[in-house]
A protein has these predicted regions:
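Soluble extracytoplasmic domains of inner/organellar membrane proteins
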Residues: 71, 76-88, 92-110, 114
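A transmembrane-helix-recognition feature enriched in membrane-embedded lipid enzymes
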Residues: 1-5, 53-58, 156
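Hydrophobic beta-strand scaffold residues
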Residues: 2-3, 39, 62, 88, ...
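Generic beta-sheet signal
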Residues: 42, 63, 91, 123-126
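A cross-family acyltransferase "interaction/gating" segment
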Residues: 50-53, 67, 98-178, 182, ...
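Residue-level preference for the first positions of well-ordered beta-strands
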Residues: 15-17, 60, 85-91, 119, ...
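N-terminal signal-anchor transmembrane helix
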Residues: 1-33, 190, 198-215
């Protein structure tokens, strides 16, 4: 697997929340190969065989779902890290897809960007085959096991992780809902897929939930 970047800035903003669509467990390694980041994920992932170990290894901040106090504590930790110049990466769909569509973004994950007066950096992620077309080979979706996913990836001759850096969005003056909607629209346009409907009016697909539920 190789990586290709488009429109990448020479340097990301000092306080930067990196926002991506989510396709696979491989995504975190694709990002870390470019810029080491702290990832945000639901606490259950920590106990997933091997995947949890990998996520912890690269640096992941886990959030316990269903516990408002834990969510507030995690949010404060994210704000502190953003203020200290750490790069924070989130997958606000909260699940994986094959990248042929986009799920609604959880607005709650954008609150730390507001509190830290950070910049939101949308990135559209795709996996391409040797001919430059879309491939599902990297997808970790539905009932696919981790071993099945690994085997599909290593047995696919050529996969390119395509990272398209879109226009940054200053959090100042925005709301978490407006940030979610703007990043949804930007990433959907870059992927050439329809922008998702409201998270309150659309059922989620069969992907793997990757983060805490939000609005």
């Amino acid at each position: 697997m190789s990586t290709r970047e488009r429109n990448a800035p020479e340097k990301l903003s000092e306080r930067c929340l990196l926002v991506l669509n989510h396709i696979s467990w491989v995504d975190i390694f694709v990002i870390n190969a470019r810029s080491p980041a702290t990832f945000i994920a639901k606490s259950e992932i920590r106990d997933w065989p091997f995947v949890g170990w990998l996520c912890t290894l690269v640096g992941t901040l886990y959030i316990e779902r269903g516990r408002p106090s834990a969510a507030r504590k995690a949010s404060r930790a994210i704000v502190e890290q953003l203020g200290g110049g750490a790069l924070i990466a989130v997958f606000p769909e909260g699940t994986t897809t094959f990248g042929r569509g986009l799920e609604p973004f959880h607005a709650a994950l954008f609150q730390p960007a507001l509190d830290a007066d950070a910049t939101v950096q949308p990135v559209a992620l795709r996996y391409l085959d040797a001919a430059g077309g879309h491939t599902d080979a990297a997808g970790y979706v539905g009932e696919t096991s981790f071993l099945e996913s690994v085997w599909t990836i290593v047995s696919t001759r050529h996969i390119v992780a395509d990272l398209n850096f879109l226009g940054p969005i200053a959090a100042r003056g925005e709301t978490r809902r407006s940030l979610a909607e703007k990043t949804e629209a930007a990433i959907a346009a870059a992927l050439e897929v329809p922008a998702p409907e409201s998270s309150h009016s659309r059922r989620r697909g069969p992907g793997r939930r990757a983060g805490p539920p939000g609005e």
